[in-house]
Amino acid sequence: MNSSTEGRPTPNLPRTANKRGVARLAAVQALYQMDVAGTGVLEVVAEYEAFRLGKEVDGTQYLDADPQWFRAIVAGVVDEQLKLDPMIHQALTEDWPLSRLDSTLRAILRAGAWELQTRKDVPTAVIVSEYVDIAKAFYTEDEPKLVNAVLDRLAFVIRGESRGVKPR
């Protein structure tokens, strides 16, 4: 994972991405910022929409994102966090409680869990794949595998669908 000058994680993403994928990435970054800096949802959404999404920041061009998708993920995770966290905790192994995960990984899992629970119009495979790709942009170790396993377990619990990982 790379770090920006403001402490916000910056991913190593390829330049080709769809607007929803970019919105997912931006939502993860915004959730991270809210977690570590205590920024409120209205403030962080306004900041991203005014100064980041589709803009150039410190010499880095942010890609265009679907602003409605971005807002829905951020607001949805904030509104549903008290329901999402216990579900994620159940999907983690016993030796990896949610509190032990770093803020970026928590943001990825919360956003993915929210989409699985709320966006029934989006195929499970798309949601899991998108958030695994986001994890790969931030991590080079086993974290993307963890994201895949946890979201797959959650997909089974929430949607009755699974891509191969058995629920705990």
Swiss-Prot record:
Functional summary from the UniProt entry: Involved in transcription antitermination. Required for transcription of ribosomal RNA (rRNA) genes. Binds specifically to the boxA antiterminator sequence of the ribosomal RNA (rrn) operons.
Statement: the UniProt record of this protein carries the keyword Signal: no
Pfam family of the protein (one): NusB
Top-level division of the source organism's lineage: Bacteria
GO molecular-function terms, A-Z: RNA binding
UniProt KW keywords: RNA-binding, Transcription, Transcription antitermination, Transcription regulation
Keyword Transcription regulation (UniProt): yes
Family, per entry: Belongs to the NusB family.
InterPro entries reported for this sequence: NusB-like_sf, NusB_fam, NusB_RsmB_TIM44
Protein name: Transcription antitermination protein NusB
Gene Ontology CC terms, in alphabetical order: cytosol
GO BP annotation list: DNA-templated transcription termination; transcription antitermination
PANTHER family hit by this protein: ANTITERMINATION NUSB DOMAIN-CONTAINING PROTEIN, N UTILIZATION SUBSTANCE PROTEIN B-RELATED
